[in-house]
Regions:
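Tandem CBS (Bateman) regulatory domains
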Residues: 13-33, 71-101, 107-116, 134-158
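Residue-level detection of beta-strand scaffold positions
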Residues: 26-29, 42, 46, 59, ...
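A signal for specific C-terminal beta-sheet/loop modules enriched in small/flexible residues
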Residues: 7, 54, 81-85
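Short, mixed-charge, low-aromatic patches
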Residues: 2-6, 31-35, 47-49, 65-72, ...
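The conserved cystathionine-beta-synthase
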Residues: 36-54, 61, 101-119, 126, ...
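A glycine-centered beta-loop-beta connector
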Residues: 50-53, 58-74, 115, 123-138
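N-terminal amphipathic/basic-hydrophobic helices that include classical n-h-c signal peptides
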Residues: 1-19
Length: 158
């Protein structure tokens, strides 16, 4: 049982997936084609890349190391709403950091729990400081509808 503010969320797990144990792993459902920007790239460059590849986030890299994430929400709340110039603001200035991530061999249930606790909708998948993929709440719901209740609570409190 996970407590979110004053809510109690039950996690129901049923055997699914191809593995012998029936547990779905993050690596099985993550998106592998992750888009990145550098810390000194402009927010405008990040937006162009997000639009070009139709993604809701980009990972921010510093010397080939993932250091943060920029989501559509970051852009709206930290650039658009205060009416800042996306061409002059740098990725490092609006990214969410430190980066919350998960390992590829973790169960999807663990990913859903982290996302609910941290109130995030995108979770980078990393192994030894290398970005391997990204997991979204949509990926989890598609692969494991039993996780829907925890994600509904996530959306309700955010």
């Amino acid at each position: 049982m996970i407590k979110l503010k004053f809510l109690e969320v039950k996690i129901i797990i049923t055997p699914m997936g191809d593995s012998m144990s029936g547990i779905i792993l993050v690596r099985d459902i993550m998106a592998k084609n992750v888009k990145t920007v550098r810390t000194d790239d402009s927010v405008h460059d990040a937006v162009v890349k997000m639009n070009k590849f139709d993604v809701g986030s980009v990972i921010v890299m510093n010397s080939n190391r993932p250091v943060g994430i920029i989501t559509s929400k970051n852009i709206l709340t930290r650039v658009v709403e205060p009416r800042l110039d996306a061409g002059t603001i740098r990725a490092k200035d609006i990214m969410s950091s430190p980066l919350v991530s998960i390992e590829p061999d973790a169960p999807v249930e663990e990913a859903a729990r982290i996302m609910a606790q941290k109130r995030i909708k995108k979770l980078p998948v990393m192994e030894r400081d290398k970005i391997l993929g990204i997991l979204s709440t949509s990926d989890i719901v598609r692969a494991s509808p039993t996780q829907l209740s925890i994600l509904q609570e996530l959306l309700r409190v955010s």
